[in-house]
């Protein structure tokens, strides 16, 4: 099965099972620029099931690191209005949120942890509406894996760049039950049903 076909199946799974995108619903995607192929395929799949709009927020880890290296500690206490408005408004519009976890795990190595914590606290406060609606499951959200070169090289240090990247993608596809014979959406539906059955049986025993 080609990489393109695997990516299509993965994106379909994300849209239909991970986010359960509804007709006329807005989808907000956050990802690094390296994950553009997955972002494009998720966008296509979302529109196929009737999404109203797909909004993409890209980041660049090199730019992000330069930001932390050069900005003052107190600057991370201020969240731009556009940033909080973006998250809060889309949450109030009942959008669903996809986060593609594809960053180099050592992207912020050596950065002053105070800067990072300042930004996290400031965002939590400024985007309270967004976090409240996510925490109580009003808004659907999902975190999925995406392969990037630096992450792949970290996981498979003895391989060439392309071999490492291919291996990481294959590991992600395998974890998501992407194969040639089965529909991953149906497989995950069966998995969910079996899990729900176990939970119900356990609850009956406890009662």
What role is predicted for each listed range?
Residues 1-207:
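Active-site bordering "gate/hinge" segments
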